[in-house]
Amino acid sequence: MEQNFLSVKGIRKSFGNVEVLKGIDLSLNKGDVLAIIGSSGSGKTTLLRCLNFLETPDEGSISVDGELLLDASDKHSLSDARIRRNRLHFGLVFQSFNLFPQYTVLQNLMLAPSLALKDEVKAIRKEKGRHAAHTYKVEQHAAIREKAKALLTRVGLAEKANAYPCQLSGGQQQRVAIARAL
């Protein structure tokens, strides 16, 4: 039997005395589509924030492709560095795309990976020196640029790489947001 790509078990989250998530379990296979619906205040956004490691559940676990990424009972899995690394497994596209108007489409796609790269470069500089860090930064920045261009091609916007969000239609902006999530 094929293992689930995403497995969520027993996710609970409370804010004060209000329990918002009450033991959520779900399993998804690759290619599955999930719609989360509910009334205002029912915990939809809180669940997504927990799945994206933007919120820490009080209880429960999250596994991706068989790898346990978070176990609320294991303090090691809740370390800041591990949570930041695990965030890279997920991308969300919300109704409002929040593209940065001062950046081109390509720059919008490259922003988050470039910011994550800064932490890596700092660690390499400390461990291996300035030259090694610079070399790594240049190589990784080129890889980020190429991946961003490939994603733009994938969503049919390669020709819009140097455009600004205000120059795109709403649908094109949404495709940029999808590429950014990927």
Predicted segments, located by residue:
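ABC family nucleotide-binding domain
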Residues: 3-182
